[in-house]
């Protein structure tokens, strides 16, 4: 786990060499840097989200006016430590803005949460995020990125697992990024019936 001084600007660690946390770049700090770079959109397709630091970065993106769409596995919405419902409620925090406008957040699941189908279906096991892809390839910019890998957005992944996280960016990678973007949009349309309700 990285020291707070690596994550929070202007925070000074007073423990010095006695600090038990990492003072070097980690998968988590790398992921947070990418999320914090978002200017227009975050399209997140994630099996599980239980790492508060990541959820906080997504919430901060919403406050900056970034449009956020999340697709997740219905079985994990209410799993121990899940941040999905809390993030979903941020969609109601932007009074006067609908999802179709430039900011806000919406969560869709691969099945209705709590249904029999939810308990017996295969998992939606993706772990990728598209940054500043906008509505399509014509909107790609120098800040457009794809994050993908085995890295779950969980405390377990941050503290214990051996995982990988790859980031693709730049025009040379736009074809691969576009493949993931199209896949995300297909799932987004497919799961339209399973929008996670708010205020529950």
PLM regions: where:
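HKD-type phospholipase D/PLD-like phosphodiesterase module
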Residues: 1-37, 48-57, 64-200
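Short alpha-helical functional segments enriched in proximate histidine and acidic residues
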Residues: 45
């Amino acid at each position: 786990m990285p020291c707070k001084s690596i994550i929070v600007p202007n925070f000074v660690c007073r423990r010095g060499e006695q600090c038990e946390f990492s003072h070097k770049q980690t998968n988590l700090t790398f992921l947070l840097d990418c999320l914090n770079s978002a200017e227009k959109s975050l399209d997140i397709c994630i099996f599980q989200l239980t790492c508060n630091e990541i959820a906080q970065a997504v919430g901060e993106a919403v406050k900056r006016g970034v449009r956020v769409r999340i697709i997740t596995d219905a079985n994990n919405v209410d799993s121990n430590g899940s941040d999905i419902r809390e993030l979903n409620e941020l969609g109601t925090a932007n009074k006067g803005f609908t999802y179709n406008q430039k900011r806000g957040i919406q969560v869709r699941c691969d099945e209705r949460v709590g249904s029999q189908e939810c308990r017996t279906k295969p998992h939606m096991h993706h772990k990728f995020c598209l940054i500043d892809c906008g509505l399509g390839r014509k909107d790609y910019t120098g800040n457009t990125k794809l994050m993908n890998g085995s890295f779950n957005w969980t405390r377990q992944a941050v503290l214990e697992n051996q995982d990988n996280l790859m980031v693709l960016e730049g025009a040379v990678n736009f074809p691969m990024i576009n493949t993931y973007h199209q896949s995300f949009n297909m799932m987004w349309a497919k799961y339209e019936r399973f929008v996670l309700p708010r205020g529950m």
